[in-house]
Design a protein with these regions (language model features):
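Conserved phosphotransfer cores of two-component systems
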Residues: 47-49, 71-78, 97
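Alpha4 helix (beta4-alpha4-beta5 surface) of REC/receiver domains from two-component response regulators
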Residues: 67, 87-103, 114
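C-terminal output helix
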Residues: 107-120
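Hydrophobic/aromatic residues positioned on beta-strands within the core alpha/beta folds
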Residues: 82-84
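Acidic, metal-coordinating helix/loop segments flanking the phosphotransfer/catalytic sites
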Residues: 35-53
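Conserved phosphotransfer microenvironments
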Residues: 55-72
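Conserved acidic segment of CheY-like receiver
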Residues: 3-16, 20-24, 54
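The C-terminal output helix
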Residues: 117-132
Length: 132
């Protein structure tokens, strides 16, 4: 049996972090190993928790979005990165900045779990369900 994917949740809102943790705690192949509410804490948390994947709110306080992704890619290039946003227009910018995937926060939990699975298999999933 494979080890579960170790996930860090990065969102400035406690309610969103709680919802994501609740969802991921139900998945047998995923383990939430950390949470952050500000960009300045993210790289250290990824490294101390040995994270495989980050769920990153596009509006995470503390650093401009593209600069944060660039810093993550420089410090933790092997870590998968899924950007979450309630604004579908952020998709292109997130993917161009280096995210492995983008998920609109209005998508279903099943969809988010499928994107996590794709990302963990190192298949870049760059299509937003709503855009064909």
């Amino acid at each position: 049996m494979e080890s579960p994917t170790r996930v860090v949740i990065a969102d400035g809102r406690a309610r969103v972090r709680f919802g994501l943790r609740t969802l991921l705690d139900q998945a047998s192949d995923v383990k939430v190993v950390g949470e952050v509410e500000e960009a300045g804490d993210l790289i250290e948390k990824i490294q101390t928790c040995c994270a495989d994947l980050v769920l990153l709110d596009w509006g995470l306080p503390g650093l401009e979005n593209a600069a944060l992704i660039e810093a993550l890619r420089g410090s933790c290039p092997e870590v998968g990165l899924i950007v979450l946003s309630g604004h579908p227009e952020d998709r292109q910018a997130a993917l161009q900045a280096g995210a492995d995937a983008f998920v609109n926060k209005t998508e279903s939990p099943v969809y988010l779990l499928s994107v996590i699975d794709q990302c963990c298999q190192r298949k870049t999933y760059k299509i937003d369900k709503g855009e064909n």
